[in-house]
Amino acid sequence: MPSGSSAQCVKPLLDKRIPLVFFDRAIDGIDTPSVLLNNVMVSHSLTQKLIEKGYRFIEMVSYSMDLSNIRGREDGYKECMREAGLDCFVNIHRVEHHESSSTIDGIMADARKRGVEAFVFATNALAVQGMSAIFRNGFNIPQDFGIATFDKNDAFDIYATDLLYVRQPLESFAKELIRILVGEIRGDQEFGAAEHIVLGAEIVNKGAGR
């Protein structure tokens, strides 16, 4: 699971022909075997589910990180909103990881004043912070805000509320990662012939809400 600044660490491994598989994220300019989620498609579908529930003024909360999975989720949101004719509502709040909690609190308070109806969160950690901020500000879910996010969090079970979340195929990820890595170790796959696996995901509707 490479970070945005890990290219300089990965290249020496490839030069030494050490078996390597990227999981969850890719690095621009480095072609190595990978098992990834189709973040654009899944984010598009997640946003579409909110639209089908009747929401129109939908914004997104994301991280200000240059990571391929985060960029893909942002692209999927924007693409879906454009296709639905909701370009005028497209707005991505990019927050710093170490300041996300305080920043999101302000985002939620301001969003209510502007009439925002729903949010897509790029990660479940952001969603938990967003939900906490919503309740601290005296708002409710889904009456005041609709929520859609990537991945489940145990905190969702604590909040008696309705939301949409992406359930990633973790078992499929594990099987493909092991299959590719074992193949590299055995020499079944020619070095440099990178195999790229892209998986879909399930969208879960927790509760019967709007």
Regions found by a protein language model. Name each.
Residues P2-S45, A125, D151-L163:
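Flexible loop/hinge segments that line or gate small-molecule binding clefts
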Residues S5-S6, M65-D66, R73, A125-A127:
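Alpha-helix capping/helix-boundary segments
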Residues P33-M60, E99-A109, A127, Q168-G187:
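Hydrophobic alpha-helical segments within soluble ligand-binding/sensing domains
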Residues H44-L86, F191-R210:
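An alpha-beta-alpha
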Residues R56-I58, C88-N91, I141-I147:
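Short acidic capping loops at alpha-helix termini that bridge into adjacent secondary structure
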Residues N91-S100:
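Short beta->alpha junction loops
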Residues M108-R210:
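Flexible loop/turn connectors
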